[in-house]
Amino acid sequence: MSKSLQAIRGMNDILPDQSPLWRYFEGTVAGLLDSYGYSQIRTPIVEFTELFKRSIGEVTDIVEKEMYTFQDNKDSLTLRPEGTAACVRAVLEHGIIGNGQVQKLWYVGPMFRHERPQLGRYRQFHQIGVEVFNLAGPDIDAELIMLTWRLWALLGIQDAVTLELNSLGTSEARARYRDALVEFLSQRIDQLDEDSQRRLKSNPLRILDSKNEGTQAALVGAPKLEEYLDEESRVHFEGVKARLDAAGIPFVINTKLVRGLDYYSKTVFEWVTDKLGAQGTVCAGGRYDGLVEQMGGKPTAGVGFAMGIERLLLLIETLGQVPESISRTIDVYLCAFGEQAELAGLKISEQLRDRLPNLRLAVNAGGGNFKNQFKKADKSGALFALILGDDELAKQEIGVKPLRGQGEQQNIAWDALAAHLETAIAQA
């Protein structure tokens, strides 16, 4: 017997009962980004593998272990593991950041990494990301953080997240620090875990955020990144902090925050929570002033962030912040009894859609007696059932029956129905 077909491990279906929360979240974020003047960009989910090697770095965990890569004739292609590289490729390819042209962009979609699936971590996961080009000052760094702070308030999770902040300095400052860190840790290499020993040669800054207790013990007394910061980065970082203070946004300086991607510089930040166990980062980003040039463009300031949708939805549910209204997908359910009533019901329903474009109206399909149709109306979650039979037809009325305890049934004239429903739904 053949094995039943199932979704790939770590790649999940989003079912109808889950979709309202996704739509609510994505709609809330999109509306907020629109209000800040950001424009949406959409890029393919498949890119040439070389794009990610050049942007993320060949000796990162993502490129070495986690990418879904395959051959297409002579080309090596990869399912995107993150969104920044594709966004940079797109703005370069289409020439929309030349001559200092400012672009404030956002995107939403699936990303792919071959990781061990666990709560809040999947092989196909979804992100909303923001990228800004040709703005080099601390004001735009602060704006991105303020934008996310406002989003947390809209979602009801502001009290459950903490902002961690750091500065990585310029590439020259990081190079000086990297040399000092390697020299320090080389004398303690036997105390480092296997991953950290490998990173000592390829990406030593990543050792700072190792979760291994032995490695953390080896880091005691290690040189600190802030001691190697250049003056430009120091002034920039002070500017970011001053703006956050002015906006009343609390933050914690985390000198071990380095981010997992090679292209970051100067400001880096993460929003973390202690409500989701090990998967505590729900949003992360920072500045990447060298990335556009690294990918073949002119020197261009860049800054952005990405937030994990699955983790944020899990946090919203964990905190009980799912709005009650989004669980209802239908406002009104129309029940019609008899062929003439069905025909009249179709006409009435389309007139209602003309008058009330936002009305969520379901018309019974498949016939059925009163008990059967009324049961379906109740099960739909609608606030009201519209009842249309021979008696109502004769009087050109329709019965409006509350389904959620909002009073008694009323018979309403057809020409007054739209106004009645608009008021009744608003009050329900």
From Swiss-Prot:
| Protein origin, superkingdom | Bacteria
Its subcellular locations are: Cytoplasm
What's the name of the protein? Histidine--tRNA ligase
A single GO molecular-function term is:
ATP binding
Which SUPFAM superfamilies does its entry note?
Class II aaRS ABD-related, Class II aaRS and biotin synthetases
Family membership: Belongs to the class-II aminoacyl-tRNA synthetase family.
Q: Which organism is it from?
A: Pseudomonas entomophila (strain L48)
The record's PROSITE patterns line, in alphabetical order, gives: AA_TRNA_LIGASE_II
Q: Which InterPro entries match?
A: aa-tRNA-synth_II (IPR006195), aa-tRNA-synth_II/BPL/LPL (IPR045864), Anticodon-bd (IPR004154), Anticodon-bd_dom_sf (IPR036621), His-tRNA-ligase (IPR015807), HisRS-like_core (IPR041715), HisRS/HisZ (IPR004516), HisRS_anticodon (IPR033656)
